[in-house]
Amino acid sequence: MSTQEIRNDIQGLRSIAVLSVIIFHLNKHWLPGGFVGVDMFFVISGFLITGIILTRKRENNFSLSSFYTSRIKRIVPAYLAMIIVVTLFAAVLFVPKDFDVFGQSVKSALYFNSNTFFARQHDYFGPASHELPLLHTWSLGIEMQFYLLLPALLLFTPRRWLAPSLLMLTAALLAWSEFCLHGENQQRVYFSLLARVPEFLFGSLAALIPRTQVSIRTNNLIAIAGALLIAGSFTFITEGHTFPGLMAIPVCLGTALLLMNRCSPINRILSLRPFVLIGTLSYSLYLWHWPILAGIRYLSSTYELPPLAAVTFIALTGMLGYVSYRWVESPFRRRMSASASYMRLVGILGVTLLTLLAATILSRKLMGPIPDALTRYGIDAELCHSHMIGDCIRGDHTAQRTLLILGDSHAAQLNYFADMVGNAIHTRFRVISSSNCVVIPNFDVDRIAEWGRADCRAQIEEAKKYTATADAIILAGMWQFHTSSTEFLTQLERFLSDASARKQRVLVLAQVPMLATNPLRIQRANHMGLHMTVSMHPEWASANEKIKAIVARHDNATFLDLSGTPVFAHVPMFNGTLIYSDSSHLNEVGSKAYGEVAIP
C-alpha cells in the first residue's frame, strides 16, 4: 500500500467504529456489542501502520524517529488539549475526593499508561466507571504501547517468516487471554496490552496477504461476510461475555476482511461522503464523547440520560469533535519541521502540567475542606471491613454480652452506631463486613465485582468463627443490590433457619433511605450556582419489603426499619448537618445519629 494512498472506505470503517462506541456509551441497551468498535480501531491501526512500515522498509527510507514523530503528531496534541479542558471542568465540578482520583488518572494518561491504571482501579467509594472522564484513554494507552512493539516485529523478522510468525503470535496470545479470562482477573485482561495485541495483528496480517485476482462474486461474498461478522458482534456480544479473548475474533476478522477488500458494494457504501466525514472526525469525536458523558452522569448520578441531556451530549460531542479536528488535530498533522512540531508539543505538555497544578489548587479553593467525619463512615484502619483489624469490637468493651453485626458496607457504616448503642445498653458488638458482600455462609460471591471476591470469601470465613457463640446477630445490607439475586434470598432463608435451630435471635435492619444523587455533589453543584435538588432512589423501599417478607417467616428473626424516625425526616441533613457520605451510606455523624434513635 502506498504511503500516500487514502482509502475512503477505511474512513467509513472508522465512522462505523466510532458511532458504535458512542451509541453503546450513550445507552448500552441500544447496541449491546457497540464497545467492539474499539477493537475495530485496533485492527484498522494494525493494518495501516504495518502497510506504512513495510512500504518504507522496501523503499529503504524507514526511520524510527520519523515514524514516532508522525504518531505523536497524530495522537498527542488533541489528546493533551482534551485533558487540559477536562481537567479544568473537573476541578470545578468534582468534590475534592473524586478530583484526587481524577488527578491520578491524568498522571497515568500523560504516560499513556491508563490501561494499567484503570485495570487496578476499584475504589468502592470513588466515582462509578461511567463517571470517570478519562476512562476512554485506556485504548489510546494500548495503541501507543503497541507502537513500541510493532516496528521491532516488522523490521527484524525475515520477510518470509513474517506472516507465519505473526499468525502464531496471534494464536498464542488469544489462547493466553482466553485462559486468563476464566480466572479471577478479567478486568486486568480486558485492559491488558497482551490481550489486545492480537487485534492489531489481525490488521497486520490483512496488510501482509498478497492481493490476488478473484471474481467479483467472491469479492462481494468476502465483504458481506466481513460486514455480517461486525454486525453480529454488535448485536450478540454483550458486557456479560468474557472479552476480548476468542470472542474478539469475529469483529477483528470481519474488519480485516473489509480492509482487504476495496471494490465491493459495501466498500463503496463506506466511501460515501457522510461516512468519510464522520471517519475523518472519528479520533476527535472519540476523545470528546466520553468526558462529556461522564460529566453529565457525574452531575446527575444516573447512567441513563433523559432526552434533553442526550441531545445536549450529541450536540456537544459533534461541536467539540469538529473544533478539536479543525484547530488542534489538523494543524499538527500538516507538514512542518520536526523541531517545530516538538516545540509545539512541549508547549502543550507544559500547559497540561500547569493546568493540573492549578486545577488541584482550584478544586480546594472553590469550597472549603470538608471534615472527614462527613465524607466517610469510619476510619478504614479501625474497621473490620474487607479485612480483619484486631477483635472488631465496638460499644462497651467490658460487657459480657456480645452481638455480632454482619453484612456489606451497610454493616460497616454501623461501627459508630454500635458504639452509641453498645455503651448505652452495656453490650459489645463485633462488626464484620465486606464490600458488596453480606458475610453469611454460601453467599453467592461470584455475583459481585471481581476485585471484592477474595475479601468476601475471607470475611465469610472469619464471621463463621463467631456466629455460633454470639448472643444474637444483626444483619445489615444494601438490600436493593442483593434482592435481585434469588440465590442470595435462598441463602438468607437458610441462614435464618440455621440460627433458629441454634435458638439464636437475628435482627435484620432495613436498608437506610437511599438518595438518587450523591449529597456531596449536590452541595458542590449548588455552591457553583447549579441548582440541584435532593430526590430519593426508587428501589430501596421495595427491597426492604422483600427482606421484611422473608424475615416474617422466621419466629427467631425481627425486621427493624428506622427510616420513619426523625433522623431521616430531612435527608441528607439532620439538625442542620450532613449525615450521608454518598447516596447510600451514612457518614460518621449519621451513624451516631442512627445509633441514638436505635437506643431502646
Across the structure, where does each feature detected by a protein language model lie?
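Membrane-interface helix/loop caps of multi-pass membrane proteins
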Residues: 1-338, 578
